Amino acid sequence: MASLKKSLFLVLFLGFVSLSICEEEKRENEGNENEEEDENHEEGSEEKRGLLDLAKHVIGIASKLGKRSEEKRYHPFGKRSEEKRYHPFGKRSEEKRYPPIGK
Protein backbone atom coordinates (compact mmCIF):
# COMPACT_ATOMS: atom_id res chain seq x y z
CA MET A 1 0.00 0.00 0.00
CA ALA A 2 2.85 2.37 0.84
CA SER A 3 4.58 1.63 -2.47
CA LEU A 4 1.30 2.27 -4.29
CA LYS A 5 0.99 5.66 -2.58
CA LYS A 6 4.57 6.53 -3.46
CA SER A 7 4.17 5.56 -7.10
CA LEU A 8 0.84 7.42 -7.32
CA PHE A 9 2.44 10.48 -5.73
CA LEU A 10 5.36 10.23 -8.17
CA VAL A 11 3.03 9.95 -11.18
CA LEU A 12 0.95 12.93 -10.05
CA PHE A 13 4.06 15.00 -9.32
CA LEU A 14 5.58 14.28 -12.74
CA GLY A 15 2.22 14.98 -14.39
CA PHE A 16 1.97 18.39 -12.72
CA VAL A 17 5.56 19.25 -13.64
CA SER A 18 5.04 18.38 -17.29
CA LEU A 19 1.73 20.27 -17.29
CA SER A 20 3.36 23.40 -15.84
CA ILE A 21 6.16 23.19 -18.43
CA CYS A 22 3.58 22.97 -21.23
CA GLU A 23 1.68 25.96 -19.83
CA GLU A 24 4.89 28.02 -19.70
CA GLU A 25 5.63 27.16 -23.33
CA LYS A 26 2.08 28.15 -24.32
CA ARG A 27 2.47 31.49 -22.54
CA GLU A 28 5.77 32.12 -24.31
CA ASN A 29 4.22 31.28 -27.67
CA GLU A 30 1.26 33.57 -26.96
CA GLY A 31 3.67 36.32 -25.92
CA ASN A 32 5.62 35.93 -29.16
CA GLU A 33 2.41 35.95 -31.19
CA ASN A 34 1.24 39.09 -29.36
CA GLU A 35 4.56 40.79 -30.09
CA GLU A 36 4.28 39.88 -33.77
CA GLU A 37 0.69 41.17 -33.85
CA ASP A 38 1.82 44.41 -32.18
CA GLU A 39 4.58 44.83 -34.77
CA ASN A 40 2.12 44.19 -37.60
CA HIS A 41 -0.35 46.59 -35.99
CA GLU A 42 2.36 49.28 -35.73
CA GLU A 43 3.27 48.82 -39.39
CA GLY A 44 -0.40 49.03 -40.32
CA SER A 45 -0.87 52.18 -38.26
CA GLU A 46 2.16 53.77 -39.95
CA GLU A 47 0.65 52.98 -43.34
CA LYS A 48 -2.70 54.40 -42.24
CA ARG A 49 -0.98 57.51 -40.92
CA GLY A 50 0.77 57.99 -44.26
CA LEU A 51 -2.49 57.56 -46.13
CA LEU A 52 -4.23 60.03 -43.82
CA ASP A 53 -1.50 62.61 -44.40
CA LEU A 54 -1.81 62.12 -48.13
CA ALA A 55 -5.59 62.44 -47.98
CA LYS A 56 -5.34 65.66 -45.95
CA HIS A 57 -2.88 67.07 -48.46
CA VAL A 58 -5.13 66.20 -51.42
CA ILE A 59 -8.18 67.68 -49.69
CA GLY A 60 -6.24 70.86 -48.92
CA ILE A 61 -5.20 71.26 -52.55
CA ALA A 62 -8.75 70.59 -53.77
CA SER A 63 -10.20 73.18 -51.38
CA LYS A 64 -7.65 75.78 -52.51
CA LEU A 65 -8.53 75.13 -56.14
CA GLY A 66 -12.23 75.46 -55.32
CA LYS A 67 -11.66 78.80 -53.57
CA ARG A 68 -9.54 80.06 -56.43
CA SER A 69 -12.20 79.28 -59.04
CA GLU A 70 -14.84 80.92 -56.84
CA GLU A 71 -12.70 84.07 -56.53
CA LYS A 72 -12.29 84.20 -60.31
CA ARG A 73 -16.04 83.95 -60.76
CA TYR A 74 -16.76 86.94 -58.51
CA HIS A 75 -13.53 88.88 -59.06
CA PRO A 76 -12.24 88.09 -62.57
CA PHE A 77 -9.38 90.61 -62.33
CA GLY A 78 -8.49 89.78 -58.75
CA LYS A 79 -9.47 91.39 -55.47
CA ARG A 80 -8.60 95.00 -54.90
CA SER A 81 -7.67 95.91 -51.40
CA GLU A 82 -8.27 99.33 -49.87
CA GLU A 83 -4.61 100.18 -50.37
CA LYS A 84 -4.83 99.48 -54.10
CA ARG A 85 -7.90 101.70 -54.41
CA TYR A 86 -6.22 104.70 -52.86
CA HIS A 87 -2.68 103.97 -54.05
CA PRO A 88 -3.03 102.26 -57.44
CA PHE A 89 0.72 102.27 -58.10
CA GLY A 90 1.67 101.24 -54.60
CA LYS A 91 3.13 103.25 -51.77
CA ARG A 92 6.69 102.51 -52.81
CA SER A 93 6.43 104.25 -56.18
CA GLU A 94 4.73 107.22 -54.50
CA GLU A 95 7.63 107.53 -52.08
CA LYS A 96 10.03 107.59 -55.02
CA ARG A 97 8.05 110.32 -56.79
CA TYR A 98 7.82 112.54 -53.75
CA PRO A 99 10.93 112.22 -51.57
CA PRO A 100 10.38 113.16 -47.92
CA ILE A 101 11.24 116.76 -47.08
CA GLY A 102 13.82 117.45 -44.41
CA LYS A 103 15.89 114.29 -44.53
UniProtKB/Swiss-Prot annotation:
Modified residues (Phenylalanine amide): 77, 89
Stored InterPro entries: Frog_antimicrobial_propeptide
UniProt feature, compositional bias: Acidic residues: 31-41
Annotated segments matching region Disordered: 24-50, 67-103
GO cellular component, one term: extracellular region
Recorded family membership: Belongs to the frog skin active peptide (FSAP) family. Brevinin subfamily.
Protein name: Preprofallaxidin-6
Protein source organism: Litoria fallax
Taxonomic lineage: Eukaryota, Metazoa, Chordata, Craniata, Vertebrata
